[in-house]
Design a protein with these regions (language model features):
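Start-transfer (signal-anchor) and selected internal transmembrane alpha helices
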Residues: 1-61, 153-165, 258-266, 404, ...
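Perimembrane helix-loop-helix junctions
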Residues: 5, 235-268, 296
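Hydrophobic, aromatic-rich transmembrane alpha-helices
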Residues: 34-37, 338, 348, 352-400, ...
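Transmembrane-helix motifs of polytopic, lipid-linked glycan transferases
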Residues: 122-154, 198, 202
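Transmembrane-helix signature of polytopic, membrane-embedded enzymes
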Residues: 140-174, 194, 209-217, 408, ...
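Signature aromatic-anchored transmembrane alpha helix within multi-pass, membrane-resident enzymes
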Residues: 159-166, 264-272, 401-411, 415, ...
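Membrane-interface transmembrane helices that cradle and orient dolichyl/undecaprenyl
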Residues: 191, 196-215, 249-250
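Membrane-interface alpha helices of multi-pass inner-membrane proteins
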Residues: 201, 214-229, 236, 240, ...
Length: 490
């Protein structure tokens, strides 16, 4: 049985991802090993520093929250000890309930059952980030496989250079790295990213071979992701719509109906699972924020709620969040005895219609600062799809256009996960991870279009690769150094 399962995934999963390209296989394995080693080293350093600080206990920054929640689940409850919630209690019937999902708790079950481990948020964050980075690298490979099925590239050497730059940006430059801090807050976001990327990966593989199991894996991934971080449910909804759109064109009625139903399931079951957990915890489909202990007790939050008409989400926060998450000057390179980077302290931007002090800001970096190569690829992606689309269509037939449209729709679906952080009352560096799926797909597809349609020009072949290499290496450096800096001030 194991042999048949292994043979199945070899023929239908890895074949789609790598498509027999030895260079891509070797590059992905090497960068995967390098990036996971760096993640492990960074987190080990962060964990040791936090654990050795005086006055830090196992409940600090929700480090023990998910283990505590699992112990409650095993006893048929969903409440947690108030000290484990670390000031994040929703007080209902004199019991403390946390708003964080149950996936990170359930993922601890095998380790608790086998090794009897308790309170190990620190180790789980390593696992979540390794899954995130490796899944991101596989998404890059699968996108290249789908694209190269239809198009030849500008030249072998340039194509390999562009591919390596995207792999670097998907590993050492990945926004998931900004979740590399030993805390339950960061871990929940890291798992949300990991399962969102896995869901996208399985959808891409399904598109190539139309085998049902990969849509089932997509559904499972998004359910787990949604119960780690709600933004994953938004991505799942739009990915499900894309699957439905593809399924409608299937010539076989039985397969069309099957994939249509699975697409509906992907769109709605993840969000329904969140609503169910909320109902079991709070007795309502959406938690009342005025039951949160900090809203009535903390003057800071009381003032914010008063200024915004007691809202925690809304378009009133959109303009301020857009500026904060995309401003290009959010990182300072501070040269002292050791070169390090830090987010600017003056990045708080209360922009109309938001009133001053009407939002919660932490010191945060931005997408354009951390991934400058993304800015270039975003411009390429938009330009080729808006300005040059008519010229592009002359070079492709209907089958190829269908593949390109699918890839574009997947980009739009992955971009849906940024909606929640953009309309949320709080702005934090860890929320940058929510932008990760959209950044990864736009960066990869932009690079493919760049490789095909930009590097055909002799002038661009001489200048643009140098610019991209500089941007990529600079972004990877900023990403890693910012994690190190934030860890030291954590």
């Amino acid at each position: 049985m194991l042999k048949s399962i292994s043979s199945f995934f070899k023929n239908h999963f890895f074949l789609v991802i790598f498509a027999g390209d030895k260079f891509r296989i070797k590059s992905t394995i090497i960068l995967g090993m390098l990036s996971t080693s760096i993640i492990t080293f960074l987190l080990h350093e962060q964990i040791q520093r936090v654990s050795s600080r005086p006055g830090i206990d196992e409940n600090w920054m929700l480090r023990n929250y998910f283990t505590n929640q699992l112990n409650s689940i095993l006893n048929g409850r969903l409440d947690v000890e108030s000290n484990a919630a670390w000031g994040e209690c929703f007080n209902i019937n004199e019991l403390c309930y946390g708003y964080h999902g149950i996936t990170p708790s359930l993922l601890r079950l095998p380790l608790i059952a086998v090794f009897k481990w308790q309170g190990f948020t620190d180790q789980m964050i390593v696992f979540s980030l390794v899954v995130s980075i490796l899944s991101s690298l596989l998404v890059v490979n699968s996108l290249w496989t789908i694209f190269h099925k239809n198009f030849t590239v500008s030249s072998r050497n340039y194509s390999r250079t562009i591919f390596l730059l995207v792999l670097l940006s998907a590993s050492l430059g990945n926004l998931a790295m900004q979740a590399a801090l030993p805390s339950g807050y960061w871990e929940a976001i890291a798992w949300g990213y990991a399962f969102s990327i896995l869901g996208i990966l399985f959808t891409l593989v399904w598109y190539c071979n139309r085998i049902k199991i990969f849509l089932v894996l997509t559904l499972i991934s998004f359910i787990l992701g949604a119960n780690s971080r709600m933004t994953s449910a938004i991505t799942a909804f739009f990915v499900g719509i894309v699957v439905i759109g593809v399924a409608r064109k299937h010539p076989n009625l039985k397969l069309r109906s099957r994939d249509f139903i699975l697409g509906l399931s992907i769109a709605f079951i993840p969000v329904l699972s969140i609503i169910l957990v909320f109902y079991l915890k709070f007795g309502t489909f959406l938690p009342d924020y005025f039951l949160h202990q900090q809203i009535p007790e903390n003057p800071f939050w009381a003032n914010i709620m008063n200024l915004n008409g007691n809202k925690t989400t809304g378009l009133i926060f959109l303009t301020s969040n857009i500026v904060a998450y995309f401003r290009p000057d959010s990182i300072i390179i501070d040269g002292t005895s050791v070169l390090f980077v830090r987010p600017t302290m003056d990045s708080y931007s209360y922009i109309w219609p938001l009133k001053k002090d009407g939002m919660y800001f932490e010191s945060s970096s931005s997408v354009s600062s951390l991934i400058p190569i993304f800015v270039v690829m975003f411009i390429v992606f938009v330009s080729l799809n808006v300005i040059w689309w008519k010229d592009l269509k002359r070079e492709i037939n209907q089958a190829i256009e269908s593949d390109l449209n699918f890839l574009k729709y997947m980009v739009f679906a992955s971009s849906a996960c940024i909606l929640l952080p953009l309309i949320y009352v709080g702005n934090s560096n860890r929320y940058l991870v929510d932008f990760g799926p959209a950044v990864l797909l736009i960066l990869t597809l932009g690079s493919l279009l760049f490789d095909k349609f930009i590097l055909n020009n002799k002038w661009s072949r001489k200048i643009l690769p140098t610019i991209l290499i500089t941007f990529c290496l600079y972004g990877c450096f900023l990403n890693l150094m910012l994690v190190r800096t934030l860890g030291r001030s954590f």
